[in-house]
Amino acid sequence: MKIKKTAGRQLAPNRINEEITGVPEVRLTGIDGEAIGVVSIRDAQNLADEAGVDLVEISPNAEPPVCRIMDYGKFLFDKAKSAKEQKKKQKQVQVKEIKFRPGTDENDYQVKLRNLIRFLEDGDKAKITLRFRGREMAHQNLGMDLLNRIKTDLDEYAVVESFPKMEGRQAIMVLAPKKK
């Protein structure tokens, strides 16, 4: 969320200290979260000044509005820090692609299979593209057999998200990692 700036000063998402106007009294919460009760706005500001922290309006729509005595700078910092942590914990799932041909040799097949296993263990989806050239289009059953072999070899690592289907001269299958 971007905070608007007015004359060099940022407008906070919550009203603080003298910005809280138009209400005669507020429901006040102390620094440690203890409920102080309903007090006049002036008394609440005096208590915040004595503690050397800010009076922050938490819930402006309540009757009377709820305010808390807290260090507002620290509050914003903690809020930004927790938002950053949340963003860091989110993992972007990528789709990794491996290309096969109907005549892929056994050694090449094993290397590509190891790469597929690595992608799936990292939590990424795997897109397997089987490309047909020239007269290979007449033997699509060989390609489908290869895709079925890949599917059975990766049974313990992946589930098939989209089954093999032909798109032009390619057969495509998408695998998703199994949930642990």
Curated annotation (Swiss-Prot):
GO MF annotation terms: ribosome binding; translation initiation factor activity
Record's GO cellular component terms: cytosol
Claim: Cytoplasm is one of the keywords in the record: yes
Pfam families linked: IF3_C (PF00707), IF3_N (PF05198)
Gene Ontology terms: biological process: ribosome disassembly
Domain of life: Bacteria
Coiled coil: none
Subcellular location: Cytoplasm
Protein task: IF-3 binds to the 30S ribosomal subunit and shifts the equilibrium between 70S ribosomes and their 50S and 30S subunits in favor of the free subunits, thus enhancing the availability of 30S subunits on which protein synthesis initiation begins.
Protein name per Swiss-Prot or TrEMBL: Translation initiation factor IF-3
Species, as recorded: Shewanella oneidensis (strain ATCC 700550 / JCM 31522 / CIP 106686 / LMG 19005 / NCIMB 14063 / MR-1)
Organism phylogeny: Bacteria, Pseudomonadati, Pseudomonadota, Gammaproteobacteria, Alteromonadales
Gene symbol of the encoding locus: infC
